[in-house]
């Protein structure tokens, strides 16, 4: 359990839509943060077995928009063959105003780059004109699996194969905007480098 407090000033330029410009101003928000973490991994780093389930709730205490945030993360780890580490994960996030106000531009949902690799961060989902504005909801499913080491004495470097699928949708402040509810996906090869820092 924790609290968080934010003061922010939202500014827009002449290219912003009328509804975006209407959100200009100064805001003070205070939230009660509830975090639930059930961790059954065999180890925190280079995990090869177990799972971790996390749920985060941000409850508005003092807020102009009274935005309620929910985030859920689930990771399952397994060893598919000797010296392999595989990870399957689910990510869900939502933001909604409990007083039927528009969710602020700064509180809207964007996908973390780790949830949809190969796409430019912040440039997926609903658009208002030329601006990517994020959504009210996001979901992602990810799978990654290490492949046999290509070089000897490279214990700190993992080569892996990954598949990502994700979506962002929902625009509460203007129902005329196409929320671009389309699943994006990617697959590829990556490097996971473990350093002491």
Residue ranges and their predicted role:
Residues 172-197:
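C-terminal beta-signal and terminal closure region of outer-membrane beta-barrel proteins
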Residues 11-156, 161, 169-171:
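C-terminal outer-membrane beta-barrel translocator/porin domains of Gram-negative envelope proteins
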Residues 164:
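Short basic (Lys/Arg) and small-residue
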């Amino acid at each position: 359990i924790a609290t968080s407090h934010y003061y922010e000033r939202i500014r827009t330029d002449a290219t912003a839509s009328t509804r975006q410009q209407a959100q200009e101003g100064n805001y003070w928000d205070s939230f009660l943060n509830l975090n639930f973490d059930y961790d059954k991994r065999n180890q925190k780093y280079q995990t090869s077995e177990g799972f971790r389930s996390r749920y985060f709730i941000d409850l508005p205490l003092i807020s102009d928009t009274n935005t309620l945030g929910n985030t859920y993360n689930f990771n399952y780890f397994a060893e598919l063959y000797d010296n392999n580490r595989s990870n399957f994960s689910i990510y869900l996030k939502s933001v909604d105003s409990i007083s039927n106000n528009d969710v602020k531009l700064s509180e809207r949902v964007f996908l973390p780059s780790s949830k949809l690799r190969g796409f430019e961060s912040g440039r997926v989902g609903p658009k208002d004109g030329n601006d990517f504005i994020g959504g009210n909801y996001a979901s992602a499913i990810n799978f990654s699996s290490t492949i046999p080491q290509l070089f000897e004495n490279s214990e700190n470097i993992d080569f892996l194969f990954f598949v990502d699928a994700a979506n962002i949708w929902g625009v509460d402040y203007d129902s005329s905007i196409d929320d671009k509810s389309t699943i994006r996906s990617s697959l590829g090869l990556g490097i996971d480098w473990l350093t002491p820092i």
